Structure formats: C-alpha cells, structure tokens
C-alpha cells in the first residue's frame, strides 16, 4: 500500500500569520479544472511561445534522468513534472511547498501503490527548512533534488535565492544531484510581443519576482556549492544540473 504523510515545519524567526480573506480562496484555486488549465497554459503555451523552452523537449527529460531513490521536489505546483517524469515506484518521494493546498494536490497526483510519499509545508528560504533529523540521520538525506519554475516566483533578491543552494546541500548525500529551471529577467534574449505581455502581467500581479535574476549569479552560486555543474540558457530559461555537494568538514 502507498504511504502518504504531511508534515508542517516552523521556524523561530516569526509566528505564522493569521489567515486573511485573500488566503481563503486557495482551495478554489486548486480545483482540477484550473490545474488542468494551468498545465496547458503556463507549462505548455507560455513556456514554449513566451520563454522559448518547450518543457517536453528540455525539462521533462532532464527531470526524468535525475531522480534518485530518495527524491526531494521543491515547489510542488500542480505536480506536473512529477507526474510526467514517470518516477520509479521504488522512489521515496518528498514534496515541499509553502502552501498546503498546492502540496495536497501534488501528493494526490503523484500517489502510487508502492511509493512512499511525504509532504512538508515549509519555507525553503530559511537556513534550516527541514526538521533536525534530516541533518543528523543520513538515511533521511536526499540523493536528488528538483526545483522547476520556482526561483522566479520567490519575492526576494537574487542573492537570497542563491543561498537556497547553500541551505539545501546540507540535506543531500555526497553524490547527490540538484536540477531545475527558472525564467530569467536579465541577460537573455529580447522578449517577443507575447512574452512582453506575459512578463508584464506576471510582474504587475506579483507572480514573478525575477527582474534581477540572471544566469551568472545562479551559476556562480551553484559552483560555490557543488563540484560538478552544468548550466544552459534555453530561450529565457536558466536550466541547471549540479552534482556532488561541497560539504563542510
């Protein structure tokens, strides 16, 4: 039988905010119909025509070929990548998001009769986003980590986004791999008319926070934290794979 669990982690930096009227419609946002539209529109049409990166050509193969026995996926979204990547049933899968409803959707979408699936609600920007046991118990460390179309949504400076790699490597095995992709805001090709409309809308509505995001700083952060680094820019998208974390002595 499948095993699906959900954990919520807390930090000492602040107390959880009280729900506001803006937060309440989240369950309505994550309806099957809207998620289907999201997959077709954002991950299909927009990624291909606006950002110049066809997910089925570039990202799904990368995801599929870099899933280990203990895999961590950060930024659950709709669970699209996990679903399309055909993850082996023997993989122990941990999915992370800062929003419970999105996480539940991804958990349900990726459920498999013989897969252990665990969900964690946490803030990946924190220096220690996971419980202490993930540091002290080697059996809990991840040999693969994915983060696709996540970084451009985080409302922090690019330097803070880069620190995620420093935080993450503590929870990875010595031969672990991290891979992902995000839409850049600087140093990429000039947006076509469709991309200009989409980018302006995403920035104005607070969906994107990537005006200063650039390939140079992301690659530098990866090389500071991993021994083996590969990066590509596909259209307006930064794609990366980094192996063997540089662990502190």
UniProtKB/Swiss-Prot annotation:
Pathway: Secondary metabolite biosynthesis
Database matches in InterPro entries: Methyltranfer_dom, MeTrfase_VrtF, SAM-dependent_MTases_sf
Low complexity bias spans: 1-15
Catalytic activity: 2-acetyl-3,4a,8,10,11,12a-hexahydroxy-1,4,4a,5,12,12a-hexahydrotetracene-1,12-dione + S-adenosyl-L-methionine = TAN-1612 + S-adenosyl-L-homocysteine + H(+)
Region (Disordered): 1-26
Keywords (A to Z) from UniProt: Methyltransferase, Transferase
Gene3D superfamilies linked to this entry: Vaccinia Virus protein VP39
SUPFAM superfamilies in the record: S-adenosyl-L-methionine-dependent methyltransferases
Enzyme Commission designation: 2.1.1.-
Alphabetized GO MF terms: methyltransferase activity
Name of the top EC class for this enzyme: transferase
Annotated GO biological process: methylation
Superkingdom of source: Eukaryota
Protein task: O-methyltransferase; part of the gene cluster that mediates the biosynthesis of the linear tetracyclic TAN-1612 neuropeptide Y receptor antagonist. The decaketide backbone of TAN-1612 is synthesized by the non-reducing polyketide synthase adaA via condensation of one acetyl-CoA starter unit with 9 malonyl-CoA units. The FAD-dependent monooxygenase adaC then performs hydroxylation at C2 while the polaketide chain is still attached to the NRPKS adaA.
Similarity remark: Belongs to the methyltransferase superfamily.
Protein name stated in the entry: O-methyltransferase adaD
Organism, as annotated: Aspergillus niger (strain ATCC MYA-4892 / CBS 513.88 / FGSC A1513)
Gene that encodes the chain: adaD
């Amino acid at each position: 039988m499948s095993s699906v669990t959900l954990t919520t982690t807390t930090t000492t930096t602040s107390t959880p905010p009280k729900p506001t009227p803006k937060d309440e419609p989240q369950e309505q946002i994550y309806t099957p119909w809207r998620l289907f539209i999201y997959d077709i529109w954002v991950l299909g049409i927009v990624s291909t025509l606006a950002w110049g990166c066809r997910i089925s050509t570039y990202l799904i193969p990368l995801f599929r070929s870099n899933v280990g026995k203990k895999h961590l996926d950060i930024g659950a979204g709709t669970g699209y990548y996990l679903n399309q990547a055909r993850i082996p049933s023997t993989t122990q899968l941990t999915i992370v998001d800062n929003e419970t409803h999105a996480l539940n959707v991804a958990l349900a979408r990726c459920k498999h009769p013989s897969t252990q699936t665990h969900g964690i609600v946490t803030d990946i920007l924190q220096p220690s986003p996971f419980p202490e046991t993930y540091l002290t118990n080697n059996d809990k460390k991840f040999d693969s980590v994915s983060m696709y179309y996540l970084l451009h949504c985080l409302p922090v400076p690019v330097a803070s986004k880069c620190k995620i790699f420093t935080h993450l490597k503590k929870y990875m095995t010595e031969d672990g791999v991290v891979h992902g992709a995000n839409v850049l805001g600087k140093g990429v090709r000039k947006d076509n008319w469709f991309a200009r409309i989409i980018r302006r809308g995403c920035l104005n509505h607070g969906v994107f926070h990537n005006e200063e995001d650039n390939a140079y700083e992301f690659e530098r952060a990866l090389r500071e934290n991993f021994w083996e680094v590969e990066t590509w820019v596909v259209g307006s998208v930064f794609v990366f794979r980094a192996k063997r974390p540089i662990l502190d002595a």
